[in-house]
Regions:
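Short alpha-helix plus adjacent loop in nuclease-associated cores
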Residues: 44, 101-144, 198-203, 304-314
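Short, basic/hydrophobic alpha-helical segments
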Residues: 52-77
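Short glycine-rich, Thr/Ser-proximal phosphate-binding strand/loop in the N-terminal lobe
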Residues: 28-56
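Gly/Thr-rich phosphate-binding beta-strand-loop-beta motif of the actin/hexokinase/Hsp70
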Residues: 11-37, 127
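Low-complexity, acidic/Ser/Thr- and charged residue-rich accessory regions of DNA metabolism proteins
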Residues: 303-304, 342-388
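Glycine-rich, often acidic, oxyanion-interacting loops/wings at catalytic, nucleic-acid
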Residues: 154-258
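Phosphate-backbone recognition surface of nucleic-acid-processing proteins
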Residues: 254-354
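Mobile genetic element proteins and their domesticated derivatives, centered on retroelements
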Residues: 23-25, 33, 78, 104, ...
Length: 388
């Protein structure tokens, strides 16, 4: 069974005299590497180019320096902050036998001064202090991000690419309509198959055909729209082929097919949920809700008690998708226990109550789908399609 992710603190005993600790402040043009060497009074810091081999040579040199001071180095721990570079560096260092972690960038506490000093050197020292506290097993210093395999990262690309293409399609359609409205044309539909032919027949509100430059711009926009639609179709067809090819194999594709059996959930939503959250082996339902950002933000001080709303600290794709799915679930699963629970708590029909409770429903629904793919427990009263 895959190991459950619990990265809020280290569960390994920290022997400071036997552990070389290295942190990396990663930027686009350079890496600033700081270390804590057992037996060495100085706290070395070295600026490197973004080169993995040079970094490895520096780590081994620091290890030899600590060994020459009489320390038996049995553990090398490296950490850097999650960001643009992703996880390739962590995977590469792990292949060389180096214990590597990726720090959640929002989990490191910083000074609340209105104008605090910020440099790469100060950031490196801050990361080092947070990482040392995490290695000691103390909570609250920082938390780590689970390092996905390259296959897991690749599996997320189709859904994310499709989401981007759908946004591009909407922008192109809106741009075409906005251009036509300037000439008093409001009924043109750019998604029709014969849109190019209809465009040539259009007349402005002044009764004249579209002029050459405007017509050329619109034809190019329609060509872009056709290309985007073809790419979306290609991604969807490829996903269906992959699901059919792996019909007898356990894994993420089996989870997608299982979730897609729930009436009201399509292949696209199921694929997003599986690859973004449900295949991550999270510890419990609380960790699941926190990762999706579907938890509250309490604000308590003295006698004041209030809720500031959603934390929004997790995966925005999952949070947005679950809110949309919750509304859809009410429409397609009216007889389910979750739908009845929502109706009972929104009997006053107040808009504020419905908006608050839809978030609670989204959280409960996410947990129900997690139980479905991990234990096979079907949501109470939910309707299922026949097995694919």
């Amino acid at each position: 069974m895959p190991q459950i992710n619990d990265l809020s603190r280290s569960l390994t005993a920290f022997e400071q005299d036997q552990t070389l600790v290295v942190v990396i402040e990663v930027s686009l043009s350079s890496w600033l590497v700081g270390g804590a060497l057992p037996g060495v009074a100085r706290q070395p810091m070295k600026k490197l180019g973004p080169d993995k081999d040079v970094l490895l040579a520096l780590i081994w040199r620091w290890k030899d320096e600590a060994s020459r001071s009489g320390r038996d180095i049995r553990r090398v721990c490296v950490a850097y902050e999650a960001g643009r570079d992703g996880f390739w560096l962590a995977r590469s260092l792990l292949e060389h036998g180096i214990e590597t972690y990726v720090i959640h960038s929002a989990s490191v506490s910083v000074s609340r001064e209105q104008r605090r000093a910020k440099t790469d050197r100060l950031d490196t020292e801050l990361l080092k202090r947070a990482f040392l506290g995490w290695l000691r097993g103390e909570r609250g210093h920082c938390s780590m991000v689970a390092i996905p395999t390259i296959q897991e990262e690749d599996a997320r690309r189709p859904n994310r690419e499709r989401e981007k293409l759908v946004g591009d399609r909407t922008r192109v359609i809106n741009r075409i309509k906005a251009t036509l409205i300037r000439f008093g044309i409001r009924t043109f539909k750019p998604t029709l198959r014969k849109a190019e032919e209809r465009l040539k027949e259009l007349r402005t509100a002044e009764g004249v055909p579209l002029l050459e430059n405007t017509r050329g711009e619109l034809l190019r926009d329609i060509a872009r729209l056709r290309m985007i639609q073809e790419q979306i179709k290609e991604i969807e067809q490829r996903r269906l082929r992959d699901l059919e090819a792996s019909s007898a194999k356990p894994g993420p594709h089996a989870m997608v097919r299982l979730i897609a059996r729930v009436v009201g959930i399509g292949i696209e939503t199921a694929d997003m949920l599986v690859h973004e959250i449900l295949s991550r082996n999270l510890r419990d339902r609380q960790a699941l809700a926190r990762y999706a950002g579907l938890t509250g933000s309490p604000d308590e001080s003295g006698s004041r008690r209030r809720e500031k709303g959603l934390s929004r600290s997790g995966n925005a794709r999952v949070r947005r998708g679950m809110i949309q799915l919750a509304w859809r679930f009410l429409q397609f699963q009216k007889d389910s226990a979750l739908a009845r629970w929502y109706r009972e708590r929104t009997a006053d029909r107040r808009s504020s109550t419905r908006k608050t409770m839809i978030v609670a429903l989204a959280r409960k629904l996410l947990i129900a789908l997690w139980l479905l793919v991990t234990t096979g427990q079907i949501p109470e009263g939910a309707s299922l399609r026949p097995a694919i």
